[in-house]
């Protein structure tokens, strides 16, 4: 069985979360609740959810070294339940990686951009430049997270835009 850990990021920094007992369905349910609850992911107190899978055979996040590529392979969102980005990163043993912005549907106009902003505790809000199709609500993001957690599924390639980060 696959195990998962989360980081919840807010104004006061990241908080690690490791549910026990757990299975992929329970983790997906818990993450869905966080993504869809306006009182939880509000874009200020809490503005990001990161989920990563523990390596096969590992049953607790404390057993995964900080340097493990597993900790740098994840799905994340940033923003609020009303407007968020969804990103996926795949990190390899040699440290190389691919990082993608996820879209709800294929990009209609590659020259069209919008901004998702949240309060990360700095004097100025954090802004992320996205195509309009890359802006999700929590309800729209939940199935993407669920597929990633329950089946290890990535969205189709036409919905992934590689980022240079």
What are the residue ranges of the model-derived segments?
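Short secondary-structure capping micro-motifs at structural edges
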Residues: 36, 58-65, 69-76
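Acidic, proline/glycine-rich low-complexity IDRs
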Residues: 1-56, 78-165
